[in-house]
Amino acid sequence: MGFSHLQKLFTTLMENNVIARTGRVQSWIDDPNSRLPVSCTVFVVEDSMEGPNGIEASWRFVSHALRYGAGVAVHLSNIRPAGTDNGQGLVASGPCSFGKIYSCLNEQLRRGGVYKNGAVVLHLDLNHPDILEFVNMPRHEIPWAKRCVDLSNVMWDMATPKVKKAILEGIARGDIWLAKIKRDQRGDRIYANVCLEVFLKSRGTCLLEHVNLGGCRPEDIVGAFSTGMTELIELHAKTGVEKTGEYLSQEDDRQVGLGMLGLANLLALEGVTYSQFSDALSHHLYADADYLVTPEALKIVKALQEGIDAAASIAKSNNMDRAFAIAPTASCSYRYKDRAGYTTAPEIAPPIGRLVDRDSSTFGVEHYDYGNVETADQVGWDVYKKVVDGIMEMLMRTNLCHGYSYNTWSDVVTYTDHFIDEWLVSPQTSMYYSLQVNQNTQAKDDAMAALDETYDFTFSDLDADDNDVQIEVDNFCSTCAE
């Protein structure tokens, strides 16, 4: 396929509203001399004050990223635990003490910079000796940083009851996220980003785009996936992120992230329920699944599979290590419409409500209507989980999947040891926000109930697409990644 034909195809699909670019990507396409199209990054801190990847270098790296509105995931597991004597008369203060510095950096740079919408997430492995201190840190000690525990099945099995209890309570109160420890095709560890949907090498960056399923007919899905992946890979070769001196080059960081939004809209437009779609997914994915499948639902599932396969083929032919990521996309979804003219719902989950009033100190009150989609309350936890597990299974089978910013529903589920065990053996890669989804239990501090720009950072939504706006509100956390 020639370049001119691809350009025409890109234009047609954009006009047809089926490719949803992040604000950063669109701005960079319009003006390559503007901010970089990548949105978040990762830094793995070595156990040394000095050196190219030491603690002081991490401060510079975090400062650089935040000043340009990016999100930074800071991985602290290599730092010695508090109280460790290095044999030269120096005693380590531990990773938690440095966590306060990253929080302070974020607070001050957001108050004084131009782009006040970066975010910091601190990561610590479950088997680190200071894990209890990390999990139990009061919010007021690190008010401008989130916390994520990285773990494996073995780590969880070996954790003490006291540690497990602290983590489960932290998840329930919204303080702690989880990310599975992940390795690339060569066995090298890769690290979760801010929103937990992308896994990177240290100093890697993420370049994201979405297929607007709500703008597609089933027969459009394959073309949308192919075009989205082709465009991302073309952009990947041109970003020039390594020129900053802080980030990996494209040759060393061969990954992009194509995701989805508007699934709820597509299902509603095709007259398919989430339950019918979940049965069709199971029927398609598992040979021994015995379901009475709705033809319209199976048609969407097969189109989705063909689209993923086509995009995976393009990514593999361009030597990409990873190529799919389902990000939190509330802000991006607000900018796009479905085939009926309604606002597209974020990512692949059912929305909490059909109507959203976004009260923004910058733009005033904006009203959004998702149309006649099913809501989370109507879909229910079991069906939601079956759908998102099924889609993640599709992506995982390509061996090119980063992950999904997977939200749990705190007013529906109970966070127990067994709940974590089930998550660990599922295709999910992270456990992001714990949301209240039932209409009669939503609270002001529900991270996804509304994107209110006056939220304290502790309760604000980290959504990959808000980085494209210059914000002038002191404590507005628009997001991090995408």
Regions found by a protein language model. Give the residues of each.
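Long, C-terminal-biased catalytic regions of enzyme "large/alpha" subunits
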Residues: M1-E482
